[in-house]
Amino acid sequence: MYKFESGILLIAYNNSKIDYAKIAAFASLAAKKSMANNHVTLMTDTFTLDYMKMSMSPELIASSFDHIIVEQLDHETNTRTHHDSPWVEFTTQFSNKNKHTIFEKSPYRKTLMIDVDYFIGNNTLDIMFDTDVPLAMYKRAVSVANYDPRIWEQKLHPDGIDMWWSTVVYWNADSEEAKLFFGIWEHVKENYDYYKWLYKFPGSLYRTDYAASIAVHLLNGQIKSNFIDQLPGHVMRYSDQIDDIVQFKGINDVTFLCPDPDKPWETICSRIKNENVHIMNKAAIIRHHDRLLEVLK
């Protein structure tokens, strides 16, 4: 039934402004350096794969991805505003509306799905593959400058339910819990406007974090319970879109320039070592392309 016992799944769909496939290659190589369960599958579309073959060497593609799932897709419109420091922003297509299909498409019995901008710097997530946990995610996050996320990244509404991050999702495909979760996620996605009204969250962007959080809430019986496990450490580290990358001394040794969210002209440097980090500023990752290739060899 499964092609492989366990591994890591990445999803990359390029658009006109962000080379997600290249970022995915960096994330994959980082995982391979840090984790024992490091068989990596890339889920992508024909447009992105064609661009990969033009912009990346065959050696880089082969060393990054052990398996590639390619589909011909017409992505639903989903426009997102990105930031590159507090002073630069741009909008572009964000193709994420089929993320719930990872349950059906993963070639693994036990899957760790990570977003392409999640860089693994240690092996703490390896422990999940040795457990009977059916499904796990992060609910809490702290920035590399030790700020809490904005309120809409802690809750769907100030008086509403907790937000769970869909940045990292682990599941065992044999479990009924995982099957139910992804089925409800799909239902929420198909009825997103209704759930947006019901849970009173703002914005026009389809957020997988919100869809997954509603699925968790429904599975929990619409109360706080422990139906969904939390990933090791219980806290996801992230760098904000307004943060910049100063230096990669190594894939597990990164220095960030972090503006104060309320006073962005005031900044600090934060050095993160041997941690897994969700690096939201994708333009900053691409700027360090050459250095990343050096440290990931």
Where do the PLM segments sit?
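Residues at the starts of beta-strands that form the adenosine-phosphate
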Residues: H39-V40, K110
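Active-site-proximal specificity loops/subdomain of glycosyltransferases
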Residues: L49-S106
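A glycosyltransferase accessory/donor-loop signature
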Residues: M1-A12, Y20-F26, L42, D50, ...
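GT-A fold catalytic core of metal-dependent nucleotide-sugar glycosyltransferases
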Residues: S95-Y147
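Short, polar loop motifs at secondary-structure junctions
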Residues: T44-L49, L73-H75, F119-N123, L231
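Short, acidic, metal-binding catalytic loop of nucleotide-sugar glycosyltransferases
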Residues: A30-N37
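Short Gly/Pro-enriched turn/cap motifs at secondary-structure boundaries
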Residues: T91-T92, H157-G160
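Glycine-rich phosphate-binding "P-loop"
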Residues: G7-I18, T79-P86
